[in-house]
């Protein structure tokens, strides 16, 4: 979107399990950002011209696929999903985790490797959720 010749930042939120939606709304209001929340099922969102909800259905990774397809250079993605963060970085988007920590090209490889290792250890029974 253009606003008086400037790119208006667009924020995409991986919304189903996002614990910081209220913070996103406040920042978006303060800075005039457009926000799209993407979810597998309907969510309650504030009635505001700059906030919209896209419900993609229950398919595996449907919300991730929608966000990765639509978020591009200059956009911001809020997600805790490391593979989605990687996809969005490749598209030129900036990515912030739900803890506020940014994912970057320099850190995403390590994050993906750590995720893979944890998944492998869980599957082999060497790591549990205590």
Language model regions located:
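Nuclease catalytic cores that cleave nucleic-acid phosphodiester bonds
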Residues: 2-130
């Amino acid at each position: 979107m253009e606003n008086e010749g400037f790119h208006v930042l667009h924020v995409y939120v991986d919304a189903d399990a996002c614990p910081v939606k209220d913070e996103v709304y406040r920042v978006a209001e303060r800075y005039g950002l457009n926000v799209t929340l993407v979810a597998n099922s309907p969510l309650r969102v504030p009635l505001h011209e700059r906030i919209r909800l896209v419900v993609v259905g229950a398919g595996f990774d449907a919300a991730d696929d929608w966000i990765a397809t639509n978020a591009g250079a200059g956009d911001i993605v809020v997600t805790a999903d490391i593979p989605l963060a990687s996809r969005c970085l490749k598209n030129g988007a900036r990515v912030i985790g739900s803890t506020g920590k940014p994912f970057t090209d320099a850190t995403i490889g390590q994050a993906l490797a750590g995720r893979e290792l944890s998944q492998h250890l869980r599957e082999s029974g060497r790591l549990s959720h205590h």
